Structures are given as structure tokens and as C-alpha cells.
Amino acid sequence: MNVFDKYAEEYDKWFDENEIIYKSEIEALKRHIPKGRGLEIGVGTGRFAKPFNIKIGVDISKEMAKIAEKRGIKVIIAKGEDLPFKDEEFDFFLINTVLEFAENPKKMIEEAKRVLKRGGKIIIGIIDRDSFLGKMYEEKKQKSKFYKDANFLSAKEVIEMLKELGFKNIKATQTIFKEIDKVDKVEVKEGYGEGGFVAISAEKI
């Protein structure tokens, strides 16, 4: 049993206990989300799919999937690097705090590109490794049941991967400018380099 199966309820509860952080991430991602048919890789408990009206998700955790399905999301148990979909099926794609757990992050983005329609958008949320928050998570990850096996990426690395794979119109927004327990309001800025959480979007041409 993987850690996300074992602690699915605890993971989901974290977002209730840290509501400002959750709302901050939603707000940063929302600026990139287009209309149309969306898919989320690593849909987890559906915390991000539901507010963005994403009806279908992929995850490897069956216990997480059960919670997501209670939120009205259809979950397919599969890996993000090997999606069970035809080419050019979706208008947009969300990968939120999942790349850091991928065996091959670039392959996951490449697979997302395959199932995206032309003109479709990929939206990626990360804890920026180069940020104060990323450095803090990196230092403490051995003590974390969730992030122990994470390989954090920087916003620069993700942007570089997107460019290498031929994506265009790359944009970023950032949030969480203080330690998590000190954040008292939702604040989002364009770009990256200050915030701990970065949302990056790009277009398939």
C-alpha cells in the first residue's frame, strides 16, 4: 500500500485545516484554467478538479480515488506517464503537485501533450524548489510521510521542459509568500521567484 492510499483521509483533511493555503493555490491555478473538457493527472481526492469543473482524473491511489468519486469525479487508476486516452482528447490538462512524484516528469508532460488538442493548455502546479518554501520542504522531507520520496523541481526547470517539448505562450503565477502557518490572506502575483507555490501554463501549438 502506498502512502497516499494509507493516509488518503489525512491528506484530504489537510486542506480543511489549511484553508488559506488551499484557496491561495486555487486562485493561482484559476488564472490559467480555460473552458472546455479537462483532465487532471494525480487527481488525488478531487480537491482541485472539483472547483475547476474537471470531471475526469487519473491517479494511482485507489483510496484517494474513492474520495474523489464522492466529489463526482470519474477516476481511472493509471500512471500519468502512460495515459489510457486517444490523441487530442482534452482541451486542458492539470498536473498539480504531482510532477515531483513522477518517475519521469518530462515523459508525463509529453504524454499530456499527446492527449491535448491543438491550442489546448497544460497547467502545472509546483512547490518551487528554489523558493524559501521549496528549500524548507527539501530540508524536512525525510520527516514527511507525503514528501519523503518527492523530487522537487524549480519553476525554471519546468519551463525549460515545456519549451523543449514545443509548448508556447508560457505563463506563471505565484502565491504563498510566507511560511504556511503565517499566511493570513490570499495573495497572487504574476511570474515566479518569490512565491513558494507556482502555477505554470503553456499552450500546445
From Swiss-Prot:
CDD domains reported in the protein's UniProt record: AdoMet_MTases (cd02440)
Classification via InterPro entries: Methyltransf_11, SAM-dependent_MTases_sf
Pfam family, one: Methyltransf_11
Gene3D superfamilies, per database record: Vaccinia Virus protein VP39
Domain of life: Archaea
MF-aspect GO terms: methyltransferase activity; S-adenosylmethionine-dependent methyltransferase activity
Family listed: To M.jannaschii MJ0638 and MJ1252 and M.tuberculosis Rv2003c.
The protein's name in its UniProt record: Uncharacterized protein MJ1123
